[in-house]
Amino acid sequence: MASTIKKLTSKYSLKSRYSNFGSCLRKVHIDGFRGINNLDLTLDFPVTAVSGLNGAGKSTLGQLAICGYKKPSTSNDYKRLYIVDFFPISVADPKPITDDAKTIYFYETDDYKKAQEVTISRAHSAWSGYKRQPERHCYYVGFTVYIPKIERRDLSVYGRASLEFTEKREIGKDVVKKMARIIGHKYDDVTFQGISHKKKESEIGIASRLGYSYSENNMGFGEGRILYTIDKLETCPEQSLFILEEPETSLHESAQYEFAKYLLDVCNRRHHQIILSTHSSVILNALPPEARKLITRDVNGVEIHHKISACHVRSILSSGHIRDLDICVEDVFAKILLTEAIRAKNKNILKAIAIHAIGDKDAVREAVKVLRKTGKKAIAVRDADVGQDITNHLLSFPGSRPPEVEVFGNITVAASIKEKYGIDISWILERDDVNDHHKIAEHIASEAETEEEVIRTFAIERYLEKITTEFDELIKNIEIYL
């Protein structure tokens, strides 16, 4: 999956984006919809996963995004969606949108420096601006798009006694394998069978496995919805836009993870743009930080936080014990280093703090911002090469380089590792061409034939034994917050 993410990141770079994804959305500016005002949704990755509490506005973002394209001129059976389809005004909801509401769509063009900008705004009771939108097939996979046939009682159910089979649509073997990998069952075959009853026509999915076959009428909701969704993603035109509402519904955790992998794969192959709302920590953790958005709503309005998910915040808020101070760091290495440095200097404060590995510098900054808005006392300790910003409660590790480089670059640490494991750190990093400091411990552990956490802990202990006052200022600043 890492290689797929790397390929997608390269394809989606600003200079290469249009050639791969066409006139996809770069940004959507939302103003005046369901309490969302002056908000920018930036789409920094082909797959964007929006998390947040119920009622925060996740669905609103997707609904407005899918209204960003007009019907392709070559499509006959395709129907586009408009803002009015999602924001009905009635006695029950007289003002879901403001009188001056508008949405500004920013599309990629062949000149990456100049995005196409189209504003959709209210002109009296109607909406103007749709005609200037680019063309694209868009698909909204909400909860009512796929309802099990046994529940909606379509003609495959009420006309079952006199059904006639019409044309059968075959599904490619590779697509069947992808569905099987997600669900966790091996399928012998999956097809869509055309059916007819009293001049009415429809289509029903039929799966074969373990020596017998069954139709959608006997499928569970999760299995049927996956079949429907994958079929759409694989058979629609390339470079389509998909909005998926909580795709994890009725899927077990392994299926959620495999589905997230599949979304990355299909975007890499078919260059779709996908925006999904989700509460699934499995899906969110399977996607890169650039794909994650957290939306929050309070008395001051609605905000979007980048590279962080609701799961990060939820895990802190529901950790099962109350600490006086939450400290956000970038990764596990930073968490262990800070924990052990505090233990060596003032171990008593460990009982008053909780340290959380969040993500990169942007995710850490956003996490602190969100936590402080919830009333939690929170700070960050960022890598030394990023620096500190005391005003925004962002402290920094000592030194001038990332913690991994400071630790493994220490002469005493290098000598200790060579003595115990017979490894020359400089040579290993040169031989393996390690440019990412997050990979240093992994490569050393591989050469030493041991686990990464063993090397990590050993190096940090040797490092802290050698240094003297380097962490004093940082720990003093942490104590100020207690």
Over which residues does each language-model region extend?
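Hydrophobic/aromatic beta-strand patches that form the interior of the parallel beta-sheet core
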Residues: 48-50, 139-141, 275, 293, ...
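C-terminal, charge/polar-rich interaction regions
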Residues: 50, 56, 427-482
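RecA-like P-loop NTPase motor core
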Residues: 2, 12-13, 285-392, 402
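Switch/communication elements of ASCE P-loop NTPase nucleotide-binding domains
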Residues: 2-14, 19-69, 213-317
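The start of beta-strands in P-loop NTPase/AAA+ ATPase cores
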Residues: 137, 240-241, 325, 378
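P-loop NTPase switch/coupling surface
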Residues: 1-151
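Extended helical coiled-coil dimerization/tether regions that scaffold
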Residues: 2-20, 143-219, 231
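Activity-critical C-terminal alpha-helical subdomain
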Residues: 58, 383-449
